[in-house]
A protein has these predicted regions:
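Acidic-aromatic/histidine active-site loop/patch
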Residues: 283
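A short, structured loop/turn motif at beta-sheet edges
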Residues: 62-68
Length: 295
């Protein structure tokens, strides 16, 4: 007797669809990922969430493996920023409660990402926890292989703080982002097309000990990021627009930066194609909702 029901068949096809999407996201060209994001964003969300769940399971099953820990951190952070936070930013304008609930959901994922990120580094460096918590000034002997761990752990902290919506117990941890990014910068400042410089744009503007000329410092990081990426990455433009132009209410520069981001050739650098697609979608959304940010 067969126990396959219509519901089982439906679930099987759904599972196969998600596995196919997951394959395209992870192993196919960026063009395939861009196409799916453009045409079927919900499918991509589901497919990547399945991938992240698998990464988290591996990290939990092998808690002493630094690679599994950082993979979980990276997966959770990418998914939470790329889907949950993006959707929350849009939703909260029209439906405050639903948007707030989505931020809370993203925050849980970021909090888990922070735990995995800290674990990935503490397994390699016993003094890491004392250093990151500020109890010790002795910087662990990081090397270039640790930059990815440092970067994604900083990203997880940034996401957790932003999605906490001002929760003091998370805001007080802001200096940890700086320690992680500055440690990575000391190893290879031009890593990954200037990603560390982009991270420093936002951190410079919100750090507790921000310099009086923080806008100029952030702009300097912006210029370095643009130079390092050969002006092929939209990320610096989005970051400067959101983190500097909105707080200073510089609407003209905000608009100028976002149009420059939109004019970047998404296909010029294959490694940046997916990132640029996501950032250009955000740039257009920011322009469409400009009155929400300037008064």
């Amino acid at each position: 007797m067969s126990y396959i029901t219509n519901n089982t068949i439906s679930l099987s096809f759904k599972s196969l669809r998600l596995e196919l999407i997951l394959f395209l996201l992870l192993f196919s060209s960026c063009s395939s990922s861009v196409y799916l994001l453009d045409k079927k964003p919900h499918w991509v969300d589901q497919g990547y969430e399945l991938h992240v769940n698998n990464l988290v399971k591996k990290a939990n099953s092998k808690p002493n493996n630094p690679m599994h820990q950082i993979n979980a951190t990276k997966g959770l952070t990418i998914h939470s920023f790329g889907f949950a936070m993006e959707n929350a930013d849009r939703l909260i304008i029209d439906d405050y409660k639903s948007g707030k609930d989505l931020y809370a959901s993203a925050h849980k994922s970021f909090a888990h990402a922070v735990i995995f990120g800290n674990k990935s580094l503490s397994l390699k460096y016993p003094g890491y926890i004392d250093w990151i918590s500020g109890d010790s000034e002795l910087i662990p002997n990081f090397n270039k292989d640790d930059i990815e761990n440092l970067y994604w752990t900083a990203g997880a902290y940034g996401g957790a703080i932003k999605s906490s919506r001002g929760d003091p117990k998370w805001v007080i941890l802001l200096p940890r982002i700086g320690r992680l990014l500055e440690a990575a910068l000391s190893l290879d400042p031009n890593w990954n097309n200037g990603s560390l410089y982009v991270g420093m744009i936002s951190y410079t503007m919100i750090r507790h000990d921000a310099p009086l000329d923080k806008e100029l410092v952030a702009t300097d990081f912006f210029n370095k990021a643009v130079e390092t990426s050969k002006n092929l990455d939209a990320s610096p433009y989005i970051s400067l627009a959101e983190n500097v132009c909105i707080p200073t209410q510089n609407k003209n520069e905000f608009t100028n930066l976002l149009y420059k981001a939109l004019n970047i050739d998404m296909h010029a650098e294959p490694d940046l194609r997916l990132t640029n697609y996501i950032n250009q979608k955000r740039a257009q959304w920011l322009l469409d909702n400009i009155d929400e940010f300037f008064y």
